[in-house]
Design a protein with these regions (language model features):
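Single conserved hydrophobic/aromatic residue that forms the stacking wall/gate
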Residues: 1-9
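Substrate-binding cleft of secreted/luminal carbohydrate-active enzymes
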Residues: 37-104
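Short tryptophan-centered beta-strand motifs in secreted/extracellular beta-sheet-rich domains
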Residues: 151-153, 203-220
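Short, aromatic/His-centered strand-loop micro-motif at the edge of beta-sheets
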Residues: 185-206
Length: 275
């Protein structure tokens, strides 16, 4: 430590505030891996073992209450830089292998033994799960699938009461008929988001939901019904605004008690509209 207690760290490059428009939404990992060490303080570069440098850290700060950011979204922003900055804080400037090699090899690692908060299924882009029929109350092989994904199924509609679920997991619910207006939609982290669409009794349709870390898109019979991307919300008589995020890690664990007929369920670990 310095005698003047002027221990320092630089946060701008390693500080996340999700969708705020200031600081980072996602860290610039290629730059951090190639150029950054805890010895970089603003434009100054200290000796790697300078006594005033106690170590390194990075942070995510959720400044905006009600912006729709989920626990899964926070984890999605943290896990990858946790790997990158762990290397940099351990090795400093001497990383040993190029970033491209590091980025490829780390994809083979799990988050931790028995941990899959990113809800990754499979190692390459492919169809990862399918069922010919989804029976009410049945369970699946996976609790959920994370970004990026496509879930599709055929449905023959029947009368459904409000609050009828298609699937649920410990983290989210996807509704055939949401509890408020009876529309298709989803709930997670205390937020309810609904599409301008409902399956009417007797209607036959092919439903497709695509999700990534920015949006959730509903297609019916191949046509986009709604792309729930980042939405601008205004408050304080329009003087202030905030970005609102409508993402979903799609629940698969248990089917709801629906009356409709659901067939040809297919789950892909990529967005099929963005090959």
């Amino acid at each position: 430590r310095s005698s003047a207690a002027s221990d320092v760290y630089k946060r701008q490059l390693v500080y996340i505030v999700p969708k705020a428009g200031y600081y980072y939404d996602y860290l610039n990992e290629p730059y951090l891996y190639k150029e950054w060490t805890p010895a970089h303080i603003g434009k100054a570069v200290f000796d790697e073992k300078h006594p005033s440098i106690l170590g390194g850290m990075f942070a995510i700060w959720n400044d905006h209450v009600g912006n729709g950011i989920s626990v899964k979204d926070i984890h999605h922003r943290i896990f990858s830089p946790l790997q990158t900055l762990s290397v940099k804080m351990w090795t400093g400037a001497q990383t040993g292998i190029p970033y491209e090699t590091f980025n490829e090899k780390r994809a083979l690692l799990s988050e931790a033994p028995g941990v899959n908060q990113l809800a990754r299924i499979g190692k390459k882009p492919e169809l990862v799960y399918e069922r010919s029929t989804v029976a009410p109350g049945s369970t699946s092989d996976y609790p959920e699938i994370g970004y990026n994904y496509t879930v599709s199924f055929d449905i023959t509609g029947a009368k459904e009461s409000e609050g009828t679920e298609l699937f649920r997991s410990p983290n989210a619910v996807f509704y055939l008929s949401d509890p408020i207006r009876g529309m298709m939609g989803f709930a997670r982290d205390g937020y309810l988001n609904t599409f301008p669409y409902k399956v009417n009794p007797g209607e036959k349709a092919t439903i497709q939901i695509e999700g990534d870390n920015c949006s959730t898109t509903l297609r019916v019979n191949g046509k986009v019904v709604d792309e729930m991307n980042t939405q601008k919300l205004y408050f304080n008589a329009g003087k202030d605004s905030m970005n609102y995020v409508r993402t979903l890690v799609f629940p698969l664990e248990k089917a709801g008690n629906f009356n409709s007929k659901v067939q040809n369920l297919k789950v892909y670990n990529y967005c099929v509209s963005k090959p």
